[in-house]
Amino acid sequence: MWGRRAAALLVVLACVLTPVPVAAAEAPVAHIDFGGLSRTYQVHVPPGTPKGLVLSLHAGGQTGAQQAALTNFDPVADQHGYVVVYPDGIDFSWADGRGASVPDRTGVDDVGFLVTLVQRLSADFGIPPGRVFVTGLSAGGFMANRLACERADVFAAIATVGASLGTNVGCHPSRPVSVLTIHGTLDPIVPIGGGPMMGRGGASTVLAATALVDSWRHLDACDADPLIEPQPGVDAQFVERVSYRCAEGSAVVYMRVDGGGHTWPGAPEILPANQVGPAIRSFSASEAAAVFFDEHGR
């Protein structure tokens, strides 16, 4: 498995996205009523029979459509056979448990909404059990971690960028969940070393990237010795991939990007570089996530 994963990783590192495209034909907005609210989302369907479903969660202040454009995940999903759903958060954010967003403070049940959404789409598209995944940037990544903590029965793996978990958020998954976390050392929004941070919705305190990895290693009953793979970088950046084998075929993988900012690897900065740090151009996070999901379904 690890030999195949290493070969697949070379494909990831060779695939670097171009700047965010303007969608030629944006998917129509769909609606679902949940918790007394009309929630919106967009769906991308690959050609052929889908192999899985990816829930892609936007950053704070963004929308599902902007997440689709930023990550350019649709063509990657077509290659890997994934239906992708891009939901919209209330007040452009998520109830990720930190208490630092409008959805959190007003009691929005985003866990329930997102689980209901993927269960409906799984039924609509015949998605096999164990082939539902989550990826997210920033606040979307925080929400992905919360989903893994609370609904490991639904989500087999997550892949996050520039995100962690609030120190006040309990994590008690019912079974192992594979986790890929990507973090830049020059991220000025979500500090790689953890501690206090100020987001769009207010202040919170978050786990350091290494503490998040250690937490998932413990929860997933991982081996003590990791596989460490330095990767080539660009723009004076250096990427180190640290992988742990874990229970029930799961894995915990940490990609630290020395010199990287609060950006989706393979895409431009979502805000000016002086606000979010340097773009990461040495690999595609979308391709990395898809390969990780390919390998870590149930």
Place the predicted regions along the sequence by residue.
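Alpha/beta-hydrolase fold active-site loops
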Residues: 51-54, 177-178, 252
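Serine-hydrolase catalytic machinery in alpha/beta-hydrolase-like enzymes
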Residues: 27-45, 49-133, 143-146, 150, ...
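A domain-start/cap signature at the N-terminus of enzymes
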Residues: 2-5, 19-53, 79, 83, ...
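Acidic catalytic loop of the alpha/beta-hydrolase fold
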Residues: 187-190, 262-264
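C-terminal catalytic histidine-bearing segment of alpha/beta-hydrolase fold enzymes
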Residues: 182, 207, 217-298
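Short beta-strand/loop motif that positions the catalytic acidic residue
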Residues: 181-183, 187
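Active-site rim elements
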Residues: 101-105, 195-205, 272-280
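Bacterial N-terminal signal peptides
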Residues: 9-18
